[in-house]
Curated annotation (Swiss-Prot):
There are 2 substrate-binding sites: the catalytic A site, and the non-catalytic B site that may play a role in the transfer of substrate or product between the active site and the solvent. Alternatively, the B site may bind allosteric effectors. InterPro entries: Fum_hydII (IPR005677), Fumarase/histidase_N (IPR024083), Fumarase_C_C (IPR018951), Fumarate_lyase_CS (IPR020557), Fumarate_lyase_fam (IPR000362), Fumarate_lyase_N (IPR022761), L-Aspartase-like (IPR008948). CDD domains: Fumarase_classII. Its main location: mitochondrion. Its EC number is 4.2.1.2. The record marks E386 as: Important for catalytic activity. Substrate binds at residues 153-155, 184-187, 194-196, 242, 374, 379-381. One of its GO terms (molecular function) is fumarate hydratase activity. It comes from the Eukaryota. This is Fumarate hydratase, mitochondrial. It holds the Pfam family Lyase_1. The gene is fum1.
Length: 520
């Protein structure tokens, strides 16, 4: 068996409201960096196949509905095969996300370890743990073919994992696949469990792991890059814009400081929502009462999952809520939705400020990564901004779906679980990928267009605001309107209209003094 990653030290990095969510050392699955377990991770080239299993051949499996033929080269069983036949919806692209499959491996391994303490034959527990570890490692990925659109509790996918792990454990012990001896998918792999508590548990495990290992690092990467630009641009004075019209000046660094703060708040929002995702439903079984499990099973499973992942999970204090409602998923999706709003604003600003190169705002020079047009030679487009804003739109759509799904719990069970899992993992993956791409291929390469910035600052009529304390609002408005009408400068009209001398204008209208409050 693969060794368990034991915890030697523990450092709390996330805590809100007294609830648990600590990352213990570096998140791993028994020593494997979890970065390899992203939804887009390439699966290993050494997939396991049953001994003697040949493509095109079948073996007979059975469930309570009777016998059914299953491909001989696959480890799944009767219930998985029936689901394949009954839910032909969407094809391979709608399969359960791989992070969820790997989370099933984590949970089934943890459950087998704990069940050993409650009477499961140690020999069977060892074989189940070994098979579950192979699920974690990705060696059984192609044995999880089911689509998201199935029973709303995720029963088919839970049984898919039970059957695959059971058959692999049978093979490890020298038995016959499909015999359910000596390892039974329900009696042994699913011991002390129900799909109703198992699926929400793996939803949380998968989401937390992906957030810790992909999304948060990507957002921090973006935050650092924007912070660097804030510092780099702090002495560049430019014109501000409100309502897409000229406004008073600010520094380019100040403008970027807004972006830095938005991303920083986004990271805080994730951290604040994480503790509820670190609460596991396991132990509630069918309706939250814990029927057919053991006292303390829920706590021990959470502890075991924590050791396997190096992230602190706790058992949910109320299993009825954990099965019937998935507010923690909706809450996290809400945080991701806010982040999508922030990133769309940032990307649109950068795209607009970089518009041109000759007929736009032209205050930023964006990296040229690829040709932009199949018909217009030399054209370069703000492609990273466009990609990021499309991701943001998708995340907003995912949140709408999650909102409906989260509101659709009925009595003791929410029956939109697979859809919730698919969309939250999609949002996490997309935002993480997009933040990395936007940072590496756009933000770090942004340069100021000094000429364009200076021209806009010089020509802006809103510099007249600096004259307010000296000649009053109405007179300032008259200067601005006259300058616009005559296509002249503020300074010319200030003098021509008799409000002061050129020297007074130069003394009072100084953009570098207009970017902060007056000192008293």
């Amino acid at each position: 068996m693969a060794s368990v990653a034991h915890i030697s030290t523990a450092k709390a990095i996330f805590r809100a409201g007294g609830l648990p969510c600590r990352r213990l050392i570096t998140p791993t699955l028994t020593g494997l960096p979890l970065k390899t377990h992203r939804m887009n991770s390439t699966t290993p080239t050494y997939h396991l196949i049953p001994k003697g299993g040949k493509h095109g051949e079948f073996r007979q499996e059975s469930d309570t509905f009777g016998p059914i033929q299953v491909p001989a080269e696959k480890y799944w069983g009767a219930q998985t095969q029936r689901s394949l036949q009954n839910f032909r919806i969407g094809g391979e692209k709608e399969r359960l996300p791989l992070p969820l499959v790997r989370a099933f491996g984590v949970l089934k391994r943890a459950a087998a370890s704990v069940n050993r303490e409650f009477g499961l034959d140690p020999k069977l527990a060892d074989a189940i743990e070994q098979a579950a570890q192979e699920v974690i490692d990705g060696r059984l990925d192609d044995n999880f073919p089911l689509v998201v659109f199935q029973t709303g509790s995720g029963t088919q996918s839970n049984m898919n994992s039970n059957e695959v792990i059971a058959n692999r454990a049978i093979e490890i012990l020298g038995g016959t696949l499909g015999s359910k001896k000596p390892v039974h998918p329900n009696d042994h792999v699913n011991m002390s469990q129900s799909s109703n508590d198992t699926f929400p548990t793996v939803m949380h495990i998968a989401s937390v792991l992906q957030i810790h290992t992909h999304l948060l690092p990507a957002m921090k990467h973006l935050h650092r890059a924007l912070k660097g630009k804030e510092e780099e641009f702090k002495n560049i004075i430019k014109i501000g814009r409100t309502h897409m019209q000229d406004a008073t000046p600010l520094s380019l660094g100040q403008e970027f400081s807004g972006y830095v703060t938005q991303v920083g708040y986004g990271i805080e929002r994730i951290n604040n929502a994480l503790p509820r995702l670190c609460l596991l439903a396991q132990g509630g079984t069918a309706v939250g009462t814990g029927l057919n499990t053991f006292e303390g099973f829920d706590v021990k499973v959470a502890e075991k999952v924590s050791k396997l992942t190096n992230i602190e999970f706790k058992t949910a204090p109320n299993k009825f809520e954990a099965l019937a409602a998935h507010d923690a998923i909706v809450e996290m999706s809400g945080a991701l939705n806010v982040i999508a709003c922030s990133l769309m604003k940032i990307a649109n600003d950068i795209r607009q400020l970089g518009s041109g190169p000759r007929c736009g705002l032209g205050e930023l020079i964006l990296p040229a990564n690829e040709p932009g047009s199949s018909i217009m030679p030399g054209k370069v487009n703000p492609t990273q901004c466009e990609a990021l804003t499309m991701v943001c739109a998708q995340v907003m759509g995912n949140h709408a779906t999650i909102t409906v799904a989260g509101a659709s719990g009925h009595c003791e069970l929410n029956v939109f679980k697979p859809l919730l899992a698919k969309n939250i993992l999609s949002s996490i993956r997309l935002l993480g990928d997009a933040c990395e791409s936007f940072t590496d291929h756009c933000v770090v390469g942004i340069e100021p267009n000094y000429e364009g910035i200076a021209r806009h600052l010089r020509d802006s009529l809103m510099l007249v605001t600096a004259l307010n304390p000296h000649i009053g609002y109405d007179n300032c408005a008259k200067i601005a309107k006259t300058a616009l009408k005559n296509k002249s400068t503020l300074k010319h009209e200030f003098v021509t209209l008799g409000f002061g001398t050129p020297e007074q204008f130069d003394e009072w209208v100084r953009p570098e003094l207009m970017i902060s409050a007056k000192k008293v």
